[in-house]
Amino acid sequence: MFDRFLDNYRNPENELANLLYGKVIDGLVKEERIKAEIKTIEEWEEKAAHIRKKFIESIGGLDFDKCNLNIEYTGEIDQGRYTIKKVVFQSLPGFYVTANLYIPNEIDGKIPGILFSCGHSKPAKAEPKYQRAAIELVLNGMAVLAVDPPGQGELIQMPDRNDVDWGVHEHSYMGLACSLAGMNIARYFIWNLIRAVDFLTS
């Protein structure tokens, strides 16, 4: 805010932030220029493939082997027009994912499947507003799989740690460990969802 009054002297307090901000702005300007140059579907598909490749590389890849999901149903709640099935599956060996599967009680052939990825709430799939959304979808004839992200719902990883809270704090704590190992925690979040799609289509 006061940079124009520095008379070409440096402001070390904000220098790193300003450098990073400048890089972000440069990147956004470049991206806008590249998007404006895309004229055909083929060019768009080529650009999309390039972005996808770079993104997957940036998180350390998604080159896991698809193991058996080892699906377990731990209970169900019959709500009349639909049933909620409590599900546990493994996205990787020993890496458990908890979810609720909402299924209409009257199914005639194949039905659409919705993967519901929960936002930042401690109860995750049990959050009332997320349940309401899933119920609206199942009442309209769709199967809905609501999945707990790591660090939320039944997947709180460090419940006995007073210095690491649920959600973003856990994500950051586990994410730092991943970064130190040369990878990104996002690959595990994404892989859980990829395997959730496998579950939905099985």
Where are these regions (language model features)?
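N-terminal hydrophobic targeting/anchoring segments and the immediately downstream early-domain regions
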Residues: 1-35
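General secondary-structure edge motif
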Residues: 4, 23-24, 35, 69, ...
